[in-house]
Amino acid sequence: MGRTENIDNGSSNEEKVALFRELFFGRQDVYARRFENAKSGRSGYSPECANKWKRGVCGLPHVKCGQCGNRQFAPITDEVVRAHLRGRDMDGKPFVMGVYPMQENESVRFAALDFDESSWRRDVSMVVKTVRKLGLPVALERSRSGKGAHLWFFLDADIAARTVRAALTYLLTVTLEEHPEIGLSSYDRIIPCQDTLPKGGLGNLIALPLQREPRQVGNSVFVNDDLVPLADQWAFLSSSSSVSRELRECNAENGKQKLITTGERSSPGNRGRFFFHGGGRM
């Protein structure tokens, strides 16, 4: 799978959009859009509908989207990504998108670890050390709020969500074994959150980075291990490495041990879900 290379801040918008779509590749037939309700103060993400607010077609506000017979998911296009990066849609309204990482065959092309509490700086630092020790490339993003972080793992092939989740669980387990005192209390979840898609569902979503307004205050951007924003976000993304076999194997102790999963859903610290094998490839 090729990667758009040699992109930097000075590259064309078309090149940036192409790179962004390659790295954050999930379901292409649907995306989520961030909403804010000024009256209730509520905010979140929901699947975008191609028929939203179309007169005579859209049932809002009297019919909920999930109950509307005219609901039609809007697909991801270059224009959707451009709107995300500039922070406004074609009508000038605020625009932030999220993607559904799990494809219909229950594989993913990226994964992430989400940290979202007061101890996130310490916890992220420890997990990053584990990742570096195991030789895995990772991209560290400060969250939209500035009060958390995502560790992104870009894959160079479609990999079963179950396999990816098991590998990331292993990274967390190794970190806890080496630093039991930290507890990883800020750890929130692995993305994708599920091993398999719920029947008729889309799975979880994740908000994408490089959101325009948060970016202006140093949030929703990629940072170095000291949490300092990188000067050229596009050059970093263009030169970022992908993993596939490495994530499957998660080598430890100089490559002598490899993660094997029982196929059961796992969670951090649930060590009964793993055993180790000294040789061979998965």
Which sequence ranges carry the predicted segments?
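N-terminal low-complexity segments that are often proline-rich with Ser/Thr-Pro
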Residues: 270-281
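Intrinsically disordered, low-complexity regulatory segments in eukaryotic proteins
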Residues: 2-11, 192-199
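Short, hydrophobic/amphipathic alpha-helical patches that form generic packing surfaces
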Residues: 19-26, 207-210, 282
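Signature for HUH/AEP ssDNA processing cores
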Residues: 7-147, 154-170, 177
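N-terminal processing/targeting junctions
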Residues: 30-31, 244, 280-281
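DNA replication initiation modules
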Residues: 99-128, 156-271
